[in-house]
């Protein structure tokens, strides 16, 4: 691996594109390896990712996955838990052959204006007069597609799950003038 090179997981989405553009702006001379996954029988974002990589002068590496689950046992043995985003196993494996640094836009949707459908729903559920706790509840309702069915009965027994504790964690983010 080369310490002068940086790898980035590139999905062609807003988040990874923004990270790549900022990386190129701040490190104009560094060699960047952009890594994308092409899944068999799925929507293919790699042509768009290739254009983005070219625009920001990054070498684009496409991993073709015919059998997404072929390395599942190995990935679980490393992480010690089942992991939803199994593609990371393949991205990290490829990145390790090229550099010691891997960047991604993972988790940036809320920071970089992704998931606009959630913002529209949040605004439809709240008003300028909504209390902070009402805003927290509306925010969680916007994420209902991420919930596990019967999560209260499942998690309550395993980890003392409590909606009140979730609300108290999120409350500071909605008890301000920026949350509407």
Spans of model-derived segments:
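ATP-dependent adenylate-handling active sites, centered on carboxylate activation for C-N bond formation
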Residues: 1-180
């Amino acid at each position: 691996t080369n310490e002068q090179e940086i790898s980035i997981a590139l999905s062609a989405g807003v988040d990874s594109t923004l990270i790549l553009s900022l990386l190129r702006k701040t490190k104009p001379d560094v060699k960047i390896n952009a890594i994308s996954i092409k899944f068999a029988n799925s929507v293919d974002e790699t042509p768009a990712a290739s254009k983005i990589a070219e625009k920001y002068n990054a070498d684009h590496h496409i991993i073709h996955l015919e059998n997404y689950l072929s390395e599942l046992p190995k990935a679980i043995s490393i992480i010690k838990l089942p992991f939803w985003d199994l593609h990371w196993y393949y991205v990290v494996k490829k990145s390790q052959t090229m550099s010691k640094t891997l960047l991604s836009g993972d988790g940036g949707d809320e920071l970089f204006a992704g998931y606009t459908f959630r913002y529209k729903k949040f605004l439809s559920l709240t008003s300028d007069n909504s209390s902070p706790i009402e805003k927290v509840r509306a925010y969680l309702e916007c994420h209902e597609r991420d919930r596990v069915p019967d999560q209260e009965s499942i998690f309550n027994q395993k980890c003392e799950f409590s909606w009140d504790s979730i609300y108290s964690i999120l409350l500071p983010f909605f008890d301000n003038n920026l949350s509407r």
